[in-house]
Amino acid sequence: MTDRRPKIAALIADAFQEEEYFFPKVALNEAGYDVEVVSSRKEPVEIYSYFTRTGLLDVDRAIMEARPEDYVGVLIPGGARSPALLAEDSRVTTFVQDVSARGGVIACVCRGSLLAARSKVVASRRMTGFNDNASYPELVVQPDAEAAGATWVQDAPVVVDRNLVTSPHPRHSAAFSAAIVEALRGK
């Protein structure tokens, strides 16, 4: 009989930020979790490093094949387009809601926090996310987070509030990844 490792769904679409996926994925794998790439469609998605396309990533499961009860958490990397594209798909936002309602960890970095806000799982929680209003005001997450009932934390490398783990930038990947693992172990 094979031991089954707990699974994390990495919700990813085109133009996701590679550093925000691969660093936490490695940390989660090392901590004993399998990470499955889940997207709206089961087609390869474009990998970006900031605004430069660097390749393609295979998708393990389309959202319609993913069952919330099979996952102990969700990883939502940022990127210029990925979180917004996913937030337009009601199957994805419902999946995030269902995993959260089951007590699963919702971990978002940078603009990934947009998907959590638009999935309505941040009310009455402290959180952070992409906040560089000077350089890219159109990508800032704070208005969506506050509209969804969250309390915005501006200058913190990681914010943990119950099952929600958020970080504003990939430069905090080590602290973010450690916080995800700690939150998962505390479940």
Regions found by a protein language model. Give the residues of each.
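Beta-strand segments within the central parallel beta-sheet cores of soluble alpha/beta enzyme folds
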Residues: R126-T128
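Catalytic nucleophile serine of serine hydrolases
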Residues: C110
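Terminal hydrophobic/aromatic helix or amphipathic segment near a protein terminus
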Residues: F130-D132
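Extended, subdomain-level signal for the structured scaffold at the beginning of enzyme domains
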Residues: M1-I106, L114-S124, A134-K187
